[in-house]
């Protein structure tokens, strides 16, 4: 019997690059408003707007674009032109149409694990955008279930455990976000593997659990996941 009933993966910045697109757009945004404020102030105000808007628009590129526009209007005191707003909309379209670039070793590791464990994706964000990226990734058929959610909370995971009759102690979540992918799972009694990404959005930061906490593991790359699973299996035998 496999050690885990399910291994679930976050998608953005766990299976493929995503935050790079946002970081690039944020740099262009700071350049667009350079005549009004310095980059640090612009980025700080944008973060405040994004945080405030999550309850209204959720996560994803469309929500990000709306926050860019709102911030631009505020910071320019309504002096931003319609042409400049159209430029921001253009960035969002470019982001939505961007190719999906898998992280190193993902294309080898996911098929390998799919032959040994039931796999699923649990990702948050805009439904249409996430569905499109999953299709573009070429990984869709390796996952038995794909769940696109608005938030990753204790309640969200609890409902998914109930939906799929999952025993928390036999569930493993793999992701790059401590508050979204790791901490809720540990609180529910599951196991979690944190694989930090090169860029971390401020909203996804949190204090790291003790390295010796039961069920918690940290890796540098997804390529280290199969050996970790082997060690976990051996320790439970």
Annotate each PLM feature:
Residues 123:
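Conserved phosphate-coupling serine/threonine residues in phosphotransfer and NTP-handling enzymes
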Residues 116-117, 189:
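Glycine-centered short loops/turns at secondary-structure junctions
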């Amino acid at each position: 019997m496999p050690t885990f009933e399910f291994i679930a993966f976050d998608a953005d910045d766990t299976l493929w690059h995503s935050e790079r697109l946002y970081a690039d757009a944020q740099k262009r945004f700071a350049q667009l408003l350079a005549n009004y404020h310095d980059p640090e102030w612009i980025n700080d105000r944008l973060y405040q707007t994004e945080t405030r808007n999550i309850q209204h628009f959720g996560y994803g590129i469309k929500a990000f674009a709306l926050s860019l526009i709102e911030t631009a209007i505020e910071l320019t005191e309504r002096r931003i032109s319609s042409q400049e707003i159209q430029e921001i909309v253009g960035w969002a379209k470019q982001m939505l149409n961007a190719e999906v670039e898998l992280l190193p070793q993902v294309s080898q590791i996911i098929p390998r694990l799919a032959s040994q464990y039931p796999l699923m994706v649990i990702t948050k964000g805009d439904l249409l955008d996430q569905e499109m990226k999953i299709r573009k990734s070429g990984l869709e058929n390796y996952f038995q279930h794909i769940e696109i959610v608005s938030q990753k909370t204790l309640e969200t995971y609890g409902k998914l455990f109930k939906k799929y009759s999952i025993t928390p102690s036999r569930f493993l979540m793999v992701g790059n976000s401590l508050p979204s992918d790791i901490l809720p799972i540990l609180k529910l009694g599951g196991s979690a593997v944190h694989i930090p990404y090169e860029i971390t959005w401020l909203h996804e930061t949190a204090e790291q659990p003790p390295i010796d906490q039961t069920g918690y593991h940290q890796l540098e790359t997804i390529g280290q996941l199969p050996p970790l699973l082997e060690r976990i299996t051996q320790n439970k035998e």
